[in-house]
Regions:
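Secretory targeting signals
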Residues: 1-3
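Extracellular glycan-targeting catalytic surfaces
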Residues: 9-21, 25-27, 39-242, 250, ...
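Long, intrinsically disordered low-complexity tandem-repeat segments
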Residues: 31-37
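Long, repeat-rich segments with strong aromatic
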Residues: 258-268, 284-374
Length: 442
């Protein structure tokens, strides 16, 4: 048969399209299998029921009860807690490594203290940052619900103490976080400390219209986050954290995404609420190191491949003594990243690699283990295993993104809070109201 130009073009097109058609058919078959499983287990099919919970109603009493309690607690910045071993200034964040250790039954009786014991690591700054990160989002959530100025004003008082007042504001860098006592070498593990500030950044975007902060104070807060964002993008230790293939790398990306959203638009950021006109001259300069477009590229090209297996596991979390807690921690942070980096024109939630690693696969894989902890197929965590799961925000955010009401229904049934600081530190998204609502424009 004589080869014509038409035959050649047709055969070439068929050869090029065949792999794509095969992948599309495979994906359709997987979707059909998933739907059949859902029907067999009595679950709602995607899109057949509402996956949008009324978070304001669900959390109303919880938020206001906590906010009322926090109104009586004054700001407690780092300078209120002197760190005797810190090589830095009173404004520098300082913490000492406090690695959780497996319980042991060897040696002296566990009921009696050892004859000599090492001093407890210094955690006062970590505790202060944790409390700050719990109180400010709660107060702002209460302001959203009630429009009562007292909540916004008390949140603003905390922000002034931590980010504005020179005498008490925290230095926007972490060279002394999670140090080994007696050393001064920075450690990448320290970057995890400020993942608590992610929800504080979310809360800040709801405050400008409250006028609880003056334009100059608001600009100073923006400058603080812009300066810290630059440090995250240039410091060697911070970049080592960025390149980790586990929750440390995810924490860096979540922080960068949250803080970049407070950056000026001409830096590639998407500040949710622009600084009021009188303070434009005080606004931070464009960040030349980190912007949201670069972070989207990192998520697509690095994070998915490095962290998620084809079946949805986080392989690098499974080798730790806390595979369950760290997997849920990582899942929640990835959900926050997808939420922060998505736009009206591009949903990061829907991005997936050709061999399937994706957020959609990860949440579907972990869903049954959140619903029934006892089915977890890997070793149980050596500590705090029975205190989980909590009301994981990944369920709510993924349920909304993928129209999966069963995720949201499970989220509603789980405990929303914990008082254990160890678990709190791996649960940085505590006020979902700040994530499902968009800050009002100026």
């Amino acid at each position: 048969m004589r080869t014509t130009r038409r035959n050649f073009c047709s055969n070439t097109a068929l050869a090029l399209l065949s792999p794509r058609l095969l992948r599309a058919q495979t994906k359709a078959q997987k979707q059909a299998q998933t739907q059949a499983q859902n029907q067999a287990q009595g679950r709602a099919l995607p899109g057949t029921a509402s996956a949008h919970a009324d978070v304001a109603a669900i959390d109303h009493d919880r938020i206001l009860t906590a906010a009322q309690r926090y109104l009586t607690q004054p700001p407690a910045p780092l300078t209120a807690f002197p760190a005797p071993n810190s090589p830095g200034t009173p404004n520098d964040f300082y913490s000492e490594a406090n690695e959780e250790k497996p319980p042991t039954t060897t040696g002296p009786s566990l009921s009696a203290p050892p004859a000599t014991s090492e001093p407890a690591p210094f955690t006062a700054h970590s505790d202060a940052l944790l409390n700050f990160s719990i109180q400010v989002p709660t107060l702002v959530a209460a302001y959203i619900l009630t429009k009562e100025a007292r909540y916004a004003e008390h949140a603003a008082a905390h922000l002034r103490a931590w980010f504005v007042a020179p005498a008490t504001s925290m230095t926007p860098a972490l060279p002394f976080a999670q140090l080994i006592p007696g050393t001064t070498k920075p450690r990448l593990e320290g970057i995890l400390e400020t993942v608590q500030l992610v929800e504080v950044a979310q809360a800040i975007s709801f405050l400008p219209r409250s006028e609880a902060l003056t334009p100059e104070e608001l600009a100073a807060v923006y400058v603080w986050f812009a300066t810290y964002l630059e440090w995250l993008g240039t410091d060697r230790t911070a970049l080592l954290a960025r390149d980790q293939k586990n929750h440390h790398g995810t924490s860096w990306l979540l922080q960068a995404a949250a803080f970049a959203r407070l950056a000026p638009e001409d830096s590639g950021g998407e500040r949710k609420v622009p600084a009021p006109a009188p303070s434009q001259a005080l606004a931070p300069p464009p960040n030349q190191y980190i912007n949201l477009n670069a972070l989207r590229h990192q998520y697509k090209s690095v994070t998915l491949r490095a962290q998620i297996t084809a079946d949805g596991d986080f392989m690098h979390e499974l080798t730790t003594p806390w595979p369950y807690r760290y997997s849920l921690f990582n899942l929640d942070m990835l959900a926050g990243i997808c939420d922060l980096l998505s736009t009206r024109f591009e949903s990061i939630w829907d991005y997936e690699l050709q061999d399937d690693p994706s957020m959609r696969v990860a949440i579907a894989h972990h869903f049954p283990y959140i619903a029934h902890r006892g089915t977890w197929p890997h070793p149980a965590d050596i500590t705090h295993f029975t205190e989980l799961p909590l009301r994981q925000p990944s369920l709510l955010l993924s349920g909304r993104a993928y129209s999966r009401p069963e995720y949201v229904d499970l989220w509603k049934t789980l405990p929303p809070d914990t008082t254990d600081p160890v678990v709190q530190r791996t649960f940085p998204i505590r006020q979902p109201l700040l994530w499902i609502r968009r800050a009002p424009a100026m």
